[in-house]
Amino acid sequence: MSIRTLNPGPLWNHFADLNEVPRPSKKEEKVIAFIKEFGEGLDLKTYVDKAGNVIISKPATAGMENKKTVILQSHLDMVPQKNADTEFDFETEGIRSYVDGEWVTAEGTTLGADNGIGVA
């Protein structure tokens, strides 16, 4: 079963989209571009700093401008691990995730949920 069928829908759809983007540690260029395009697509202030951090800023809701700012943070990369019998290129392929009973898992590789679910 596809993870896109899970609830809450927006979370799992974002996670599925993210897992389509190769993002092994030390090779985050593709996922940085993906997240940057995501923020820009929502017309949010979006930039990438010298370290490769993607910062997306959303203005306060009307009437909440004087409230404290909330910051959500998570890392974009994932540790590229696969089963010995699995052919997979973490630099060019997206993670093939699916639902197995009560678990979300991946076909022969790590799922990328640390910290991909935080990014989603």
Predicted regions and their residues:
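Structural signal for hydrophobic packing residues in well-ordered secondary-structure cores
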Residues: A16-N19, G39, D43, P80
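Conserved short-loop catalytic and cofactor-binding motifs
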Residues: N19, R23, Y47, T110
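Generic hydrophobic, helix-prone segments enriched in Leu/Val/Ile
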Residues: F15-L18, K26, I56, M78, ...
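N-terminal capping segment at the start of a domain
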Residues: S2-K26
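Predominant activation on well-ordered alpha-helical scaffold segments within soluble catalytic domains
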Residues: W12, A16, A33-K36, V119-A120
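Active-site metal-coordination/substrate-binding segment of hydrolases
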Residues: M64-A120
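A non-catalytic alpha/beta surface segment that caps or lines the substrate-entry region
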Residues: P24-K68
